[in-house]
Amino acid sequence: MKYGFTKEELLVFGKYDPSEVQISDPALESYICLEPKYVPHNHGRHANVPFAKQKVFIVERLINKVMRKGHNTGKKILAYNIVKEAFEIIEKKTKKNPIQVLVDAIINAGPREEVVRLKYGGIAVPKAVDTSSSRRVDIALRNIAEGARRAAFKSKRSIAQCLADEIIAAANNESRSFAVAKKEEVERVAKSAR
């Protein structure tokens, strides 16, 4: 019994156990929080505290990214239901724990190297730099949500189906995933700017 709840009550969406999830990238272990919550909603308590977002449950962070812009701004229950439906689709298609698939997708979609612009005597010079683990998780989640949003735009498929396909493709490291394609593009530019 943890935090006054039984183990059955702390399953994500009442179905998925985060305790059996393995994080294969040691650099991201302390930045992907798998501590379950009864309801994945912390009322933005992490907003003004430095580095507090790494203690926010990873499923809640995905829900927040899905809620991000346009018609879905501020509609957390809608975003919650989208992610819940996407997880059900992922479980049907892959026969795996959807949280494990999401973690694999984040590991594959986070860029390891980026480009910054340095100014030398009025001339901007691109320079390749390593990406921090926290930023890797942020960019991966943002690109997964953005890829789902773009795939669902002017499409018959629901955003939940598009989100599920995006997460599965990113977990398999396929280039048809928007997030993986974006990561490869950023790393290619960084390689040329070394």
Curated annotation (Swiss-Prot):
Coiled coil: none annotated. It comes from the Archaea. GO terms for cellular component: small ribosomal subunit. GO terms for biological process: translation. One of its GO terms (molecular function) is rRNA binding. Keywords: Ribonucleoprotein, Ribosomal protein, RNA-binding, rRNA-binding. Pfam families: Ribosomal_S7. One of the primary rRNA binding proteins, it binds directly to 16S rRNA where it nucleates assembly of the head domain of the 30S subunit. Is located at the subunit interface close to the decoding center. PANTHER family: RIBOSOMAL PROTEIN S7. Belongs to the universal ribosomal protein uS7 family. Part of the 30S ribosomal subunit. This is Small ribosomal subunit protein uS7. The lineage of its organism: Archaea, Methanobacteriati, Methanobacteriota, Archaeoglobi, Archaeoglobales. The gene is rps7.
